[in-house]
């Protein structure tokens, strides 16, 4: 019996068999991704698809400087507010930057007709030619062109007026009827602006225009309107009780525009031949101009990124990532990062892909760890790793290419009377934005799930490849490991890794060792049966002796009486 127990203990203590394990790479990465089924999965490698940073500056767009209006609004710039004179030298720009609260707009109070539409038109203009449509000195010989100034449009402390308009007044006590036309020979659209003066009282009307009733008529192929001055007292704005209403039209190449009036005309002086450019726009921003270049400009600042999505601002100009409301869009490229606990032993927690990855394997995603008499070591499976890298890289590039539709997204212009339309437009835009955000997030979740499943499948395939080679020359011991029934030196280990393992060569040795182990198991089973019987009998005897002793003690002290009746 003692000899049999000794054999059993010796057999159980033998743990020096050669072993090979299949596992995967792990590192100290803290990157986390979300999948359809899980959140915050730690992975070895990932790529960010969402840009959330900017430089806080206005930059040149593709090397072309923007038109920074400074303290001027679009209206002040295009009408020629004297305080905006420094902007007249700007002939071309990449985009127009306007501050939220521009001081210099329409210096003489009044209504600017279709102002939001004009802004929309100018948002697609990248350059223009400013030219005299009606030269000041020779176009109006019967009218005064110098006295039409006002303190509300002062410049350097003196009364002045818009630099692109002429306020025609009476000359030598009369204001003759006028008729002036212009033919567009610029081969481009020409922007023409004019105004109609509405005095606050009849005395001003007579003093300036020498008549009580007046009209202004403007006609072209696409525009036909007749204006009648409205003489009325109004609240003072910028010191004025009168008003000037401002109007504009786009004159097509070859078209003619005709002005007729007998008073109250604020005549065009300069007009603009427009050149439209793709990617231009108007942004409202407090950011300052800087010496920098970018491909994408937002009101918050410039974005220099090739990522497909951004959450900086919905208004963009240039080649910009698509705006989404997401706070995180990270796509996994590596594996689940579950580093094994080194202290639990080589073939314990770090044995394979079931319990964790290997931080010691740094030259590939999947691979092997072996242990034999010659030592131990890691080796990556380069073929499966490279195939996985190629597949995932192509997928990531494809996703970025499909979603990376870069474009300009500018805000739409609405006036105060179009509030319901603006609110409806915002709801529609919000709906599209929600769809874009949902699609982007769902795409990333699905692709992350597929990538992690892909890695799991690759590890399993590598495991099955080894298992199919070894067959019954080794046994599975869990954790992705196999224990050989034969000695396997480094050459043998290498053959398993590269798929050239010679099964017949090791079959006989494996068979003998397998039978020896099976014999020990059978003998051990017999020993266990004897031990079980012995233990049962010994336990029963101990129980009977204990019961007898208790009964004798109870009878001796009278606690238990035994009567035998015959």
Swiss-Prot record:
GO molecular function: host cell surface receptor binding
InterPro entries: Capsid_hemagglutn, Hemagglutn_HA1_a/b_dom_sf, Hemagglutn_influenz_A, Hemagglutn_influenz_A/B
Residues at the site labelled Cleavage: 344-345
Record-annotated disulphide pairs: 21-481, 59-292, 72-84, 107-153, 296-320, 488-492
Pfam families documented for this protein: Hemagglutinin
The record's account of how the chain is modified after translation: Palmitoylated.
Topology term for the membrane: Single-pass type I membrane protein
Transmembrane feature ranges: 530-550
GO biological process, one term: fusion of virus membrane with host plasma membrane
Residue numbers on the Cytoplasmic membrane side: 551-566
Top-level taxon in the UniProt lineage: Viruses
Subunit structure: Homotrimer of disulfide-linked HA1-HA2. Interacts with human CACNA1C.
Family designation: Belongs to the influenza viruses hemagglutinin family.
Protein known as: Hemagglutinin
Gene that specifies this protein: HA
